[in-house]
């Protein structure tokens, strides 16, 4: 997923699929990245928030905070899961 330079990244586990606006992969957290337990502030310079693997409580907290300070940006949610095949094969029998 491409992340804008004016975005805030809030994560529970760091994803392996983030790229910045120039196309480089963001390997480790940087100065615009926070965990859900850390404190952060939203201001007008931040245009969007990317939430990575949030819990339902984390989503609710961010939504309440956004509404309370009247921040007018976008919120994107990224869920990463391991691709586990089903325990059976799908077969098209004729």
Swiss-Prot record:
Subcellular location(s) of the protein: Host cytoplasm; Virion
InterPro entries with a match to the protein in the record: A15 (IPR008445)
GO biological process: DNA-templated transcription termination
GO molecular function, one term: ATP binding
Chain segments annotated as transmembrane: none
Gene Ontology annotations for the cellular component aspect, listed alphabetically: host cell cytoplasm; virion component
Keywords: ATP-binding, DNA-binding, Helicase, Host cytoplasm, Hydrolase, Late protein, Nucleotide-binding, Phosphoprotein, Transcription, Transcription regulation, Transcription termination, Virion
Subunit (UniProt): Part of a complex composed of the kinase OPG054, OPG092, OPG100, OPG114, OPG115, OPG142 and OPG157.
Function: Late protein which is a part of a large complex required for early virion morphogenesis. This complex participates in the formation of virosomes and the incorporation of virosomal contents into nascent immature virions. Required for the stability and kinase activity of OPG054.
Family: Belongs to the orthopoxvirus OPG142 family.
The protein's name in its UniProt record: Core protein OPG142
């Amino acid at each position: 997923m491409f992340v804008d330079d004016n975005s805030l990244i809030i994560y529970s586990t760091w994803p392996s699929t983030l790229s910045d606006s120039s196309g480089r992969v963001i390997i480790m957290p940087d100065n615009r990245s926070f965990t859900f337990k850390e404190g952060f502030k939203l201001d007008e310079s931040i245009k969007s928030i990317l939430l990575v693997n949030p819990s339902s409580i984390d989503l609710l907290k961010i939504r309440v905070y956004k509404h309370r300070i009247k921040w007018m940006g976008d919120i994107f949610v990224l869920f990463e899961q391991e691709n586990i095949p089903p325990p059976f094969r799908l077969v098209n029998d004729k």
